[in-house]
Amino acid sequence: MSQAPLVLVDGSSYLYRAFHALPPLTTSKGLPTGAVKGVLNMLKSLRKQYPDSPFAVVFDAKGGTFRDDMYAEYKANRPSMPDDMRVQIEPLHQSVIALGFPLLCVEGVEADDVIGTLARSSAAADRPVVISTGDKDMAQLVDGHITLVNTMTGSSMDIEGVKEKFGVAPEQIIDYLALMGDSSDNIPGVPGIGPKTASGLLVGVNGGLKELYEQLDIVPTLPIRGAKTLPAKLEEHKEMAFLSYQLATIKIDVPLDVGLDDLHLIEPDREKLLELYTQLEFKSWFDEIQRDAKRVELKAAPVAEDIVEAAPAAPAETTYTTILDQATFDAWLKKLNDAKLFAFDTETTGIDAQQAQLVGVSFAVQPHEAAYIPLTHSYIGAPQQLDRDTVLLALKPLLQDPSKLKVGQHAKFDMNILANCAIGGDPANGISVRGIAFDTMLESYVLNSTATRHDMDSLAKKYLDYDTVSFQDIAGKGAKQLTFDQIPLEQAGPYAAEDADVTLRLHQALHAQLTAIPSLASVLTDIEIPLVPVLARIERQGALVDAQLLGVQSIELGNKMVELERQAFEIAGEAFNLGSPKQLGAILYEKLGLPVLKKTGKGQASTAEEVLAKLAEDDYPLPKVLMQYRSMSKLKSTYTDRLPEQINPRTGRVHTSYHQAVAATGRLSSSDPNLQNIPVRTAEGRRIRQAFVAPKGYKLLAADYSQIELRIMAHLSKDEGLMNAFRNDLDVHTATAAEVFKVELAEVTSNQRRSAKAINFGLIYGMGAQKLGKDIGVDTKTAKAYIDVYFARYPGVREYMERTRAQAADQGYVETFFGRRLYLPDINSNKPQERAAAERTAINAPMQGTAADIIKKAMVLVDNWLTASGLDAKVILQVHDELVLEVREDLVAEVSEKIREHMSAAAQLDVPLVVDVGVGDNWDEAH
């Protein structure tokens, strides 16, 4: 039987990565615990994976090391350890020991050196070794006995894995690090040499640093970009390169007080773990130990008739009040006015905020205590309720007072409901809620935008370990589902009160985590929360659409679909149902013999849109026709047929809903209708925009940021060439074309500019040479040459991309200019396709996310100005980087100037933000 491997865990590496890469957690008292939980989860996973193995969990000791003596600047660039990480070290150490793992800290050296010593010692005794780490330095230890695993990503690395990832063998890793340096440890390396150049040099000389310096004369002949300039650079920084070699070398001879025989697991200390889990509020782990202990007791106990299961811990006692009398209402109104912060929620007859009717309002001022004020429950036998208008008039000063701070869950919906509540039947007499300080949906979203659900029920389970009463529990399902006004107060009251209570409790849990990361707290308070009332106003304003024009377009699209269907039948040689995947698959793959690019989960050849798009790119006629048909069908069903049905009978307008907590990058999305998906590059898509019209006496004004993501790229990369192009107001695509095609600016053709535009935007989205070649109609080799020329002209862009990939892999997330985080769970995946996709996201997300933050800040600035000025102009739509306003004709010039001014001031970048403004009678004309 093969020997179980020695498992060596790089505790310090995992502590850092868990703290930075995982969403933060805190106890109810504000103690940070997320990193502790992340590392312990990893250790538990390892223990299950290697149940028979000896273990050591190794952490850095306090104080300096021999490397600090060698180089005073070693790790000097690192910010001091965050306090929220520092306070987690001691409970983590205690938890590791209580779980039964040997824990090692050795003064004067780093955890890497202790691990290196133990690993080499074990390998010398022919025992296999698994090093659990996320640190690339450890790759130098890999050999026939030693393997690296990264439990946080599920990846592993042997000798071949090292070669695949770094382009060099394990024995060359120290040389590799010596050349490129390591920014995280402030190892200097040779300036200007990155990962690809370092590996290219070492492979080129078939050796290490020593061999490289002995063969500098052959370096100019190596197939490396800029090879001719490298010998001088290497010679100039030779001393630093060899110092870097020493700094990057892991010691394998550290004197230790323990031997391999001392590194065995022991039984967990349950009492200590219960104490720690209570302190850290790891409720599920606490319960798990209790259950295990109970099972052991029951198994060991003699058979008896009176053994009784232990009762579950009682939940905190709640006091939920349904208010039906004036005295109770007055008492609660005073309580709300005296509170520093209160939670509120509305109950309604539906989920369309522009048409639903208000049924009741709930409030909470402290955890586990809440009240519901029913207003219009009308089921048979419903008790008498307080007068709706009297209650709303009493609540109005409180809800409209900006100094009375409020928290909601998806507060925009409640704001719209109350704004539309029409007190006394007067549509203009609503409640304009002010003082929204927090929104738990947005707090959750800002903490981790890649999480899929930010609804109250999901958040309560995740952050409070609490199961809420669902709407279906009290209203039923399907066609027989009751509206809220028909639900008896015995059920409706506690349900509604719970909504307010849980909202307040969620805020307390989420706010503690956000304040631990100031940059995220700033994103919430400076960007997301101020935007809530702005979006609410835009939604209520709505947009005017020409239903008659849409009807004409619908007929035209239908006629085009009939013609495309005829063409499809002609190509196929028979009639078939274009909407049937089965029939379509038979035609494409069996009859016409097209290549099968992808299969469904059931093993059938796929006819999905991305498959048809790829086949259409490859010039197969039927997929081209099918793609056109599907495009027309989508426009017809989603817009020309549907938009007239979405006109609100009360306002005569279409009211889209904007979503702040959906897109991971921070971008807004919309629904009913989805404005983002109206195509702008096709004539049919542009015609749909023609149906969004200005009322008589008004114009539509469209204000759009010009090339905003490229400008953000220039700012983030600090590339002088790109920044100068924007600072000098050059057409950046023309400037790029002049560089790539080696012509003067005045000689650039429209085709060359189009190709340069594809290069500029393609590289932002991580496009490779093959895809670029297809897009601009050249072979892959030529496209690669264009990319090489581009990076030679804009070297800062390449450096930014490499730096961003490395930082993302190291910390597990990227950030926007304003500090918004995007977590990348696949950035260290051992599946190349997943990792490559995450790397593309890492490069693009800071730009797309920063653009999203900028337009959000611009919306707030514009709204503040419009509100203060009192001008007859209103924002009616927001799409991507564009705002659309409805402006009285005589104010167009003034508003155009001010819109440019405010949108340009939304961010201070190293290049100017330029805003293009267009005006017309419809949305399309305004472009």
Could you say what each language-model-derived stretch is?
Residues 2-132, 136-158, 240-243, 249-257, ...:
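Noncatalytic, basic helical substrate-engagement surface that gates or grips nucleic-acid strands
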Residues 482-485, 533, 537-540, 648-651, ...:
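Conserved catalytic core of nucleic-acid polymerases
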Residues 559-566, 570-624, 792-840, 844, ...:
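C-terminal polymerase-core module
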Residues 129, 344, 409, 438-440, ...:
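Conserved catalytic palm subdomain of right-hand nucleotidyl-transferase polymerases, strongest
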Residues 237-381, 426-429, 433, 451, ...:
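Conserved "right-hand" nucleotidyltransferase catalytic core of DNA-directed polymerases
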Residues 147, 152, 169-172, 179-246, ...:
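Accessory alpha-helical DNA-binding modules that contact the DNA backbone or grooves
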Residues 22, 73-88, 139-168, 230-232, ...:
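Short alpha-helix plus adjacent loop in nuclease-associated cores
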Residues 5-7, 11, 17-56, 72-73, ...:
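Conserved RNase H-like, two-metal-ion catalytic cores of nucleic-acid enzymes
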